[in-house]
Structures are given as structure tokens and as C-alpha cells.
């Protein structure tokens, strides 16, 4: 049975990757269908009730700069906002918001249901229709076939998902949802390497049974940050506090006593879990010398009593979970509302993807999110946007696009995955980006919004706001460079008391702002120097561009140098054994990863700059050095 309409792009799955993929394709004008097993769970936050953080917040800002929904939904759902690393340099500052699950889901669903060119249909997908290594459609659980030349799979943890609580396990996509068994089996027939990964979630606690007076209160920032470049504090709902408590030796003894019934430590779970979000069992085992571990007590929303205890993800049996929770200060009488669990699921080796996130094996088939071995809402959303966008470009007969590593964290993410692959759930950190001084949260729109507009991702409202901001930054920088203070100027009366060293020669306003003791707000508050910019985002940009100009230029020079060979192609039939001077280790790694370009080769672990130089000399001698058009 065939559906009565054809589509340009079909997106399978309605989580963070799927929603961004469907919205991106639809914004670009493609007739798009979003298939989900349950419309009510579109935009569901399956694990922690938070968006953003170190590295992750950078991705959210990039999604936003390209017209995505995640930041906007967070502004409408965020019940606590904080800027992390606020005392450090701008490259590593990151916005994090505690989110009300229900409000977030409602906002995402509202955006989806009001997006032109987008249809939503509730049915699980069981099969792909492939002809001559090209996807042409999908078949749902009830045998209904939908046709489209581009399919984006965003299956999350549903592919052959298996939930573990103690020694008990059962099939599931997440708690309360069925797994995608038939689709997983179909995908295993394709010529794409497959593996198993694992993630987990903590038990949820009834807030009425917690003694918050025994814990440390953690309030949000004042003034409140916003997540979206076009967001406003007035969109935020009521703000609440989080709390901090700790495990103790009694907690650790309870956990150790239950390890014989842990699916992780008894060999029941095969999948590898996230290194940077370990279960409490892993923490006790890996950091045996630590007497306590921090736990963040996070509200799940304004209309629920459920609490998310961030830091005690576990798959231990329920009785052990209850005992370990009640051993923690402030939770002596706590009641568990939902047990913690681990979930194993299929993922596919992202080295079998192009950087457009299209599979190399099947034309028109795109993967995004946890199916590619990543973990996290933000990583999923960023991939979803890229996959949906490239699916739309393919249907339009246009060239695929992916930002470079020096252009976006999204570029770092995709390049890491498609070049290096992953054996454990991959999450983003600022440390993964070698050019992080240029890839800041604050300038994501300046880096990407113009490209987003060119691609058709950015609407008029966002574009007009961006143009106004960009012009105000440029005009203010011109003003600061063109206005000067002289040693005999009347302005020195208000200026010199604010300086560590008084003015002895003429200086531009830009020179004054560059001084370590001066900031933009202080300079603009002095009589004769203002009034300055009212837009705080633009003012921040002016200050950063002035104060860090030397470092920014140095990093740009490094990028220009690397880019000269970044896109130099490596011939598909290149025999690395024939390249004189390469070590056996380097040859093995190059043969294993099969990089497409010199840039990709340079980022393979163990490939030294010397090896890249040898490779370039060999290619040049053979007349094989050519670049991507």
C-alpha cells in the first residue's frame, strides 16, 4: 500500500536530530515528511532536563545561527540559566539552561506543527526501499510505503534497544517506548559497519521526599542569559534553583556490594558507555580513591515533583538504587518515582558517512544523531540540521555543504566522526577544536548566519536582526578606531583616574579599550566617550574583537596556512606502502581510515606533521596533488 503523495525528504524519528532535520529541509522549501512512532513524544528530552554546557552550548548557538529550533525552545522552557566558565576567556564560556521537559516538548511541537512544507505522520518505520544502491522510500509497521529520494534516519537509542535494570533486561527504545527491531535488522543488511553502544539515566526522585535544607543551593545567573541570538529574557518562564549534594563512603559501599548484580560488571552489557558521563558504578570503580562525588539536584519542570539527580546514572537493581539514594545527604527519606536504567543500542560506524552525513553505501540515505555514535541532545540536533539541509540540497540538485573545522564546532564534530570514527559515545568539548578562539558561542551568528541565509535556512526576521547587529558592530569599531585622545585633551580629566598608566601620547579609543584595566562598559560610561551600543550582544562582540585582535589574527594565520593543503585530495587507489619514508604504523592507520583529503589524514591519531610532509612531497613528485573543486 502506497501513500497518496510523494515527498522530497523523509525524516524518520522525532527526537532532537529528527526535529532539526525535518525543520531544516522544510525551511529550504523541500516537501518534507516527519515519521515518528508517537507524535506526543516529539521533542522529548529522554535523559537530563538541560540544554547547553561546555562545547554543547557552542553547538546550540550554531544550530540557532543556522535557523534551528533548539535555542528558541530553550528560551521558552529554561527554568535556570547559567554562563559556565564566566571568569575564563570567551572561547570556553558556555551557556547552560535547566529546562522544563513539558515546556520544551510543547515549544518544539508548536514549531513543527506550524512549519510550512512539513507534514507529520505517526507510524514506526520497519523497512527501507532501496534500488540499485539508492534509497527511494520507507515502509511503516502497517505496510504503508512512503516515497522520497532522500531519507534521514534519526533513530536515537531505538535500534535493537535493550533496557537493563540489574540482571533483568527487556527490549525497549527508551523507558515506555518500543524498540525498532525490524529496522535495525534491515540496516544490518547494508554495507555499513555496525556496533553496540550503551548509555544510562539516573532514578527520578520525588521532590516532596527530599530535604533541600541539607544541600547547597545553586541559583541561576543575574542578569539572565538567553540561548537564542533572537531570544529575549521576557520569554523565560519562572526561574528556580538547583541544589548540590554528594555521595559518601556509605554510598560507595552500597554500590560495591551490588556490583555482582550489575549488568555492566557481570558481562551482560556489551556496549561501551560514555566516557564523560559515566554511571555511578563506573565512577566508584575508576576513581576508587575518591571519597565522594558531586550530585546536582535538578528540577524536571515547574509542574512536576520529579527531580533528576545528575551524577548517579545507574543500572543497578532497584533495591540497590533505593539504598544508594537514601545514603546521600538530604535524601535519607527519598522515594524513587522512576528507576534508573542502562540501554544498549545499535550504532553505525560514522567513517562510512560522507561529511554531508549521507551514507557512502546508499545514495540518498542520511544518518544523524546517536545512530552515528554520538551522545547528547546538542550533538544530535547539530547533525540533524546538517543532514536535513544536505538531503534538501541533494533533491534540489545542489552541492552538499559542511562547515570546515575552523568554521564551526559542527565542522569539528562531523570531521572527527567521518575521519576517526568512534568506539564510545562521542560528546563535544571545546578542547576538540584546535581553532576554538575563533569558534566562540558569541560569534556563531557572525560565522554562520550569512551561509544559512544563502542555503535558505534563515528566515527574514532572523536575517534582519543579524544584519542590524553586524552593521552596528562594524560602525562602532570604525568609531573607536577613528576617535583619538591627545595628551592635552580635556577628556584626560575623566580618563586618567581609570587607567593604571596615564596617557602620555595620543591614543585611539580602540587603544584605550585594549588596555587590560578597561572594558567597553566602563569606557562608554566616561563623559565624552559614549554613548556606545545598547545591544549587549553587539557590545560584547566589539570588546572581544578589540581585546583579542592579536590572538585572533594569529589563529587566522594558522588556519590560512593549514587550508592551503586541507582540501588536497588523496587518490582513492593510493598505495601508502609505496610512499617512501612512512612508518609501518602510519601506513596501517592510513589504510585503516582511508582519508579523502590531506586535512583528514592530518587529524588521524598518530599521524605526525612529518608524515604529512612526506605524503605531500610524494603527491607533488607524482603530479597527484590536486584540490577539491
UniProtKB/Swiss-Prot annotation:
Cited SUPFAM superfamilies: FAD/NAD(P)-binding domain
Q: Which domain of life is it from?
A: Bacteria
Entry-linked Pfam families: GIDA, GIDA_C_1st, SAM_GIDA_C
Residues given in the record as NAD(+) binding sites: 273-287
Location comes to: Cytoplasm
Q: Per UniProt, which keywords does this protein have?
A: Cytoplasm, FAD, Flavoprotein, NAD, tRNA processing
Instruction: Give the residues the record marks as binding FAD.
Output: 13-18
The cross-references to InterPro entries, in alphabetical order and at most eight, read:
FAD/NAD-bd_sf, GIDA_C_N, MnmG, MnmG-rel, MnmG-rel_CS, MnmG_C, MnmG_C_subdom, MnmG_C_subdom_sf
Biological process, per Gene Ontology: tRNA methylation; tRNA wobble uridine modification
Cofactor(s) this protein requires: FAD
User: What GO cellular component entries does it have?
Assistant: cytosol
The primary location reported for this protein is cytoplasm
Family designation:
Belongs to the MnmG family.
Describe the task this protein carries out.
NAD-binding protein involved in the addition of a carboxymethylaminomethyl (cmnm) group at the wobble position (U34) of certain tRNAs, forming tRNA-cmnm(5)s(2)U34.
Q: What is this protein called?
A: tRNA uridine 5-carboxymethylaminomethyl modification enzyme MnmG
In the record, what lineage is assigned to the organism producing the protein? Bacteria, Pseudomonadati, Pseudomonadota, Gammaproteobacteria, Alteromonadales
| Gene this chain is encoded by | mnmG
Amino acid at each position: 500500500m502506497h501513500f497518496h503523495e510523494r515527498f522530497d525528504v523523509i525524516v524518520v524519528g522525532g527526537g532532537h536530530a529528527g526535529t532539526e532535520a525535518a525543520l531544516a529541509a522544510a525551511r529550504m522549501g523541500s516537501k518534507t515528511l516527519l515519521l515518528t512512532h508517537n507524535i506526543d513524544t516529539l521533542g522529548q528530552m529522554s535523559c537530563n532536563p538541560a540544554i547547553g554546557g561546555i562545547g554543547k552550548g557552542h553547538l546550540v548557538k550554531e544550530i540557532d545561527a543556522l535557523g534551528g529550533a533548539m535555542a528558541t525552545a530553550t528560551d521558552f522552557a529554561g527554568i535556570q540559566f547559567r554562563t559556565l566558565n564566566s571568569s575564563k576567556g570567551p572561547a570556553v564560556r558556555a551557556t547552560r539552561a535547566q529546562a522544563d521537559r513539558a515546556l520544551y516538548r510543547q515549544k518544539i511541537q508548536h514549531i513543527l506543527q506550524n512549519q510550512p512544507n512539513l507534514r507529520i505522520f505517526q507510524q514506526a518505520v520497519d523497512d527501507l526501499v532501496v534500488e540499485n544502491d539508492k534509497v527511494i522510500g520507507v515502509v511503516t509497521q502497517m505496510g504503508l510505503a512512503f516515497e522520497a529520494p532522500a531519507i534521514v534516519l534519526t533513530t536515537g537509542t531505538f535500534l535493537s534497544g535493550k533496557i537493563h535494570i540489574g540482571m533483568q533486561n527487556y527490549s525497549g527504545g527508551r523507558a515506555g517506548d518500543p524498540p525498532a527491531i525490524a529496522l535495525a535488522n534491515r540496516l544490518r543488511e547494508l554495507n555499513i559497519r555496525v556496533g553496540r553502544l550503551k548509555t544510562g539515566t539516573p532514578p527520578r526522585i520525588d521532590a516532596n521526599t527530599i530535604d533541600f535544607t541539607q544541600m547547597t543551593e545553586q541559583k541561576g545567573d543575574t542578569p539572565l542569559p538567553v540561548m537564542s541570538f533572537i531570544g529575549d529574557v521576557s520569554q523565560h518562564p519562572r526561574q528556580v534553583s538547583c541544589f548540590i549534594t554528594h555521595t559518601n563512603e556509605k554510598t560507595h559501599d552500597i554500590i560495591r556490594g551490588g556490583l555482582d548484580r550489575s549488568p555492566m560488571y557481570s558481562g551482560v552489557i556489551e556496549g561501551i558507555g560514555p566516557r564523560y558521563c559515566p554511571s555511578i558504578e563506573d565512577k566508584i570503580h575508576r576513581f576508587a580513591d575518591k571519597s565522594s562525588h558531586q550530585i546536582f539536584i535538578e528540577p524536571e519542570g515547574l509542574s512536576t515533583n520529579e527531580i533528576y539527580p545528575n551524577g548517579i546514572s545507574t543500572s543497578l537493581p532497584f533495591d540497590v538504587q533505593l539504598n544508594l539514594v537514601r545514603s546521600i545527604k538530604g535524601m535519607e527519606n527519598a522515594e524513587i518515582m522512576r528507576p534508573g536504567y542502562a540501554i544498549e543500542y545499535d550504532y553505525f560506524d560514522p567513517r562510512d558517512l560522507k561529511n554531508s552525513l549521507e551514507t557512502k553505501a546508499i545514495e540518498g540515505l542520511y544518518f544523524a544523531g546517536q545512530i552515528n555514535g554520538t551522545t547528547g541532545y546538542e550533538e544530535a540536533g547539530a547533525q540533524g540540521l546538517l543532514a536535513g539541509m544536505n538531503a534538501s540540497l541533494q533533491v534540489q540538485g545542489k552541492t552538499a555543504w559542511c562547515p570546515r573545522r575552523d568554521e564551526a564546532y559542527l565542522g569539528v564534530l562531523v570531521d572527527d566522526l567521518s575521519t576517526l570514527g568512534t568506539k564510545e559515545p562521542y560528546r563535544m568539548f571545546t578542547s576538540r577544536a584546535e581553532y576554538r578562539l575563533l569558534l566562540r558561542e558569541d560569534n556563531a551568528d557572525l560565522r554562520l548566519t550569512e551561509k544559512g541565509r544563502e542555503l535558505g535556512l534563515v528566515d527574514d526576521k532572523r536575517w534582519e536582526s543579524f544584519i542590524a547587529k553586524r552593521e552596528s558592530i562594524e560602525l562602532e569599531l570604525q568609531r573607536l578606531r577613528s576617535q583619538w585622545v591627545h595628551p592635552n585633551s580635556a577628556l584626560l580629566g575623566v580618563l586618567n583616574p581609570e587607567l593604571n598608566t596615564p596617557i602620555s601620547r595620543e591614543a585611539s579609543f580602540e587603544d584605550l579599550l585594549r588596555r587590560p584595566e578597561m572594558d567597553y562598559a566602563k569606557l562608554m560610561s566616561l563623559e565624552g566617550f559614549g554613548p556606545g551600543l545598547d545591544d549587549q550582544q553587539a557590545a560584547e562582540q566589539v570588546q572581544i574583537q578589540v581585546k583579542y585582535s592579536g590572538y585572533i589574527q594569529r589563529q587566522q594565520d594558522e588556519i590560512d596556512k593549514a587550508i592551503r593543503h586541507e582540501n588536497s585530495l588523496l587518490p582513492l587507489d593510493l598505495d601508502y606502502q609505496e610512499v617512501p619514508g612512512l612508518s609501518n604504523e602510519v601506513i596501517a592507520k592510513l589504510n585503516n581510515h582511508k582519508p579523502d583529503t590531506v586535512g583528514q589524514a592530518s587529524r588521524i591519531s598518530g599521524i605526525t606533521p612529518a608524515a604529512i610532509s612526506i605524503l605531500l612531497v610524494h603527491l607533488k613528485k607524482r603530479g597527484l596533488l590536486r584540490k577539491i573543486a
